[in-house]
């Protein structure tokens, strides 16, 4: 199992390094967040988080779409790795992208977020990853439409979170909704593997 996990990790690392769309979008997002209009905006906190969701979501979407389009799911079955491991390894790399964007935005984040905000921010990033995976699984040749719908859902959830004023409820809501969609996304991966076996 450990050797198979290493194989999967190497595969995902290779894809992560050469996912040019995600890297280009990450650079654009970082540069755009330093525009004067963005830095002085009253919605700076929402804008930065929306940028993070956009960049990490694009990475997850492209990665899953590649797996589905080029028999990556079959590869997963052949090496005997459970779909849950695939989800969390992809989440690891999307978290790295999130970290890069947040580190690059430290001057913009000062006074906007506190450390405790990570308890609801990170679940939303995970939620976005799950939504992107689900949309990639049901793309059916309409890549742009599926991606746009997934991003819209993620942004809508982010808006809902911002409307919640009680910090504790914000954390609970983000964690519960994220756990639900992570469960759904992993079940969909299992169903993909099952259909390959038929």
Mark where each language-model region is.
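Hydrophobic alpha-helical transmembrane segments of membrane proteins
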Residues: 1-71, 87-198
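Short helix-to-coil transition segments within interhelical loops
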Residues: 77-83
